[in-house]
Amino acid sequence: LDAVTSPPSTPLCLKLARSYDRIGNHAEACRWALSLVDAGDDYAAWQAGWTLFQRNAQRTVWPAARTVKVAIAGSYTTTQLGAMVRLAAARIGIRIDLYESPYGQYQQDIIDPASNLYAFAPDIVLLAVHEGDLHLAEFSPDPAEEVQREVSRWTALWNLATTLSRARIVQHNFAVPCDIPTGHLATRLPGSRYMMTQAVNTGLGAAAGTAVSIVDCERLSALIGKQRWYDPRYWNLSKQAVALDALPLLARHTAAVIAADLGLSRKCLVLDLD
């Protein structure tokens, strides 16, 4: 029964990928490793799938619609995110050559014209940042000015990166944390960090236009659950701002946005014949 489910289950995909890997059928091992992207959001399975895909793709001709150079300019540990994005992108026919900024050096990499980021000559710069990077007070007497200043800070980074390279920008916006000092009162206080963070997200969306693509991490964190999105254990142990369990979801949506930027999104015409 598992063999005819659509999509196949995560354990089945992983079992088949490993079986084909053992017998040396590299193309089928790749196919089933990539099927894990559609099967669910199990981080351990995705990690195993990426290892299997990497090993077998080197030994067979694996077609890719596009090859793209992506630079992750991150404010937290992005090693795991990079692997997950590459797996999700491979599933939709994109081969990613990856550069990762050193931990927390995203601003320095973007500001310095001689940085390794620009030497890499990326097609896409992915700003993988989190709510803790916002220069916002817990409460502001002038929230409009503070929000505008913060929006301008991020758009200045966009403009600098596009001026010093030909790359498009993909920006992760900011997931509002579930622990808020002012609690339910925050929604009544325009100057609370909670409300200003949402205003920054709205401002970035308005400023992006057609030049910058936004991955809506605030929506994704609500989809998976705020307590699953951020786990303080991972932050304290390895400065991982997005919990490992949430990385597959974030990677899938990031890869989809990259595909759309490359013109690889799919159109579907649905006709109701009733």
Regions of interest found by a model, annotated:
Residues 269-270, 274:
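Alpha-helical substrate-recognition element adjacent to the catalytic core
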